[in-house]
Amino acid sequence: MTLDARIGLRLGSLDLRVELRAHAHEVVALLGPNGAGKSTILRCLAGLEAVGDGRISIDGVVVDDPDADVFAEPEARPIGYVFQDYVLFDHLTVLENIAYGLRARGVAKTEARRRSHDWLERLDLADFAHQRPQVLSGGQAQRVALARALVTNPRLLLLDEPLAALDARTRASVRRDLRDHLASFDGMRLMVTHDPVDAHALADRMIVVEAGRVVQSGTPADVTAHPRTRYVADLVGVNLVTGVVADGVLTTQTGARVVIADAADGPTLATIRPHSVLIGSGDGVASSARNSWRGTIVDIDRL
């Protein structure tokens, strides 16, 4: 299974130009600041937005190509979608919510209910089959939304901030459950998140989008070790310094000089990790640090 997507779209102030590829058994996390285009990418893949230019194919089947006048409606795409706030229908029972996607695809009511009940059993929700979503906890609501997305046997599963609606107390346990459920799904999985912890815990690969462009991609370890933009550095909790290296010294645009190790001459990026910083008072601190600066501490965040 392979997703190949080249998406070009202008939507308000957003100019989206990205290329994505995903494979079976892979969890890809899309990260980026608000307004970067992450959720819009999911909407284009799901058929909720048509691309302005580009091409989307799933397993070699083209579902969106304006040049060829091809556009498959959402219900005709082999996709499951877990929305950020789960979007469960309050007027339907839990069983009817899960069956909704099947019914929209023309599956007979009896068969849709049978398949939906199977998923309720798998996700330990059978006791809630005939209750309304209002009685569900955040974790239970997420499992219902996941069951609704998976009951149609999709090839591609889209998850938009699947843990954002949860409070801090339940987030960790639900994250563990979600990881197990994703591992049992053998299709392609694409997840939007703002949280690097979620990305590290759930994703095999990270794609960072800023201002409608992919600025970095790689494994969580690679992205964390080598942030390429200020946003990525802030995301993974390091300080990013840009400048030009000559003879082992990086000089920034403001004239600050940083001694660095193992870098060729020329423009480069350097990272300073919080655990590498030593703060002292007085005329100096005895250490083996290659760099030292004088300054005034105005605030300290205790993490």
Q: What kind of feature is each model-predicted range?
A:
Residues T254-D301:
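Glycine/charge-rich catalytic "coupling/switch" loops of P-loop NTPases
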Residues A29, F71-E73, R77-V87, L190:
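ABC nucleotide-binding domain signature
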Residues A46:
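Helix-to-loop junction immediately C-terminal to a conserved catalytic motif
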Residues G54-P66:
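Conserved ABC transporter NBD signature motif
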Residues V18-A29, F89:
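Pre-Walker A (P-loop) beta-loop-beta motif of ABC nucleotide-binding domains
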Residues P78-G80, T93-R228:
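ABC ATPase nucleotide-binding domains
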